[in-house]
């Protein structure tokens, strides 16, 4: 059989089409926060070494992760992130957030009622001590009469409808939420192909082809910021930007996995093949 016939034979075999990830059973979702500890997470605050949780900025109280500043005098530009330790490429991240309390003294005006979650972030161990923002893409959480689940791009660029977005932040189409209201959000990340922001299961923003580039991030290692590098994977990080905020019900659905339908580890909603997972869940 010549190569053409082999190719035609392969093309004739029906290929499984991924189903919507909303069909995934709840047991397939992984809890990233155990409600008791910050196990599996690492803190990085600007002007502090990796792992230095100055002032207990990130803490666990009453089953939620809280960003608190009661042990601070002044904010001191200590922009912070709590990173999950696993690198990810194709997934859905779900969580709930709520603002509370007053912004700490010295926090910038734009950071009032402002937080977010970073995706496709550089590895936390590559963030320099005095670096303000990780090179990443941010799903931005806002209150105070503003839309939420916007997108911001510290050290990155994104595309919408085939055009590079020039603005650092772009608003979503969300409704306005109360200042202290719990908001349930999801970020669907499909490698470098697409990122989608959802609230209560409804899409409010979508963009494509995230890559390293642009400004805003400062104090980074030039060896890390290689402009034009397409981002197809990275880390997630919860943000501490001077406003007290709570996070809960942090869950992950991996969309990368076994592509062989005969394997117990196969899932019809997988969109990216990783056949090293065919013997495990």
Region locations from a protein language model:
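Sec-dependent N-terminal signal peptides
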Residues: 4-12
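Extracellular calcium-associated, cysteine-rich motifs in secreted modular proteins
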Residues: 256-281
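Carbohydrate-interacting regions of secretory-pathway proteins
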Residues: 16-264
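N-terminal export signals
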Residues: 12-13, 275
């Amino acid at each position: 059989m010549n190569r053409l016939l082999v190719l035609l034979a392969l093309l004739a075999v029906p290929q499984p089409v991924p189903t919507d990830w909303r069909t995934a059973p709840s047991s397939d979702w992984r809890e990233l926060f155990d409600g008791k500890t910050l196990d599996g997470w690492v803190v990085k605050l600007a002007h502090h070494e990796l792992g230095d949780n100055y002032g207990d900025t990130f803490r666990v109280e009453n089953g939620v992760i809280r960003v608190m500043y009661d042990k601070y005098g002044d904010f001191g530009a200590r922009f912070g992130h709590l990173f999950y330790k696993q690198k990810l490429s194709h997934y859905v991240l779900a969580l709930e957030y709520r603002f509370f309390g007053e912004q700490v003294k010295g926090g910038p005006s734009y950071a009032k009622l402002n937080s977010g979650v970073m995706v496709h972030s550089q590895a936390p161990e590559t963030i320099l001590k005095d670096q303000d923002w990780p090179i990443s893409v941010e799903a931005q959480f806002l209150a105070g009469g503003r839309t939420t689940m916007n997108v911001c791009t510290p050290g990155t660029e994104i595309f919408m409808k085939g055009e590079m977005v020039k603005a650092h932040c772009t608003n979503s189409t969300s409704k306005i939420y109360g200042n202290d209201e719990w908001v349930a959000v999801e970020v669907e990340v499909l490698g470098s192909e697409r990122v989608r922001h959802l609230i209560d299961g409804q899409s409010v923003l979508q963009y494509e082809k995230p890559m390293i580039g642009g400004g805003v991030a400062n104090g980074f290692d030039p060896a890390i910021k290689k402009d034009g590098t397409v981002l197809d994977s990275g880390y997630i990080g919860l943000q501490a930007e001077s406003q007290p905020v709570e996070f809960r019900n942090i869950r992950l659905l991996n969309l990368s996995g076994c592509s062989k339908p005969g394997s117990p580890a196969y899932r019809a909603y997988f969109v990216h093949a990783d056949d090293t997972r065919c013997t495990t869940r």
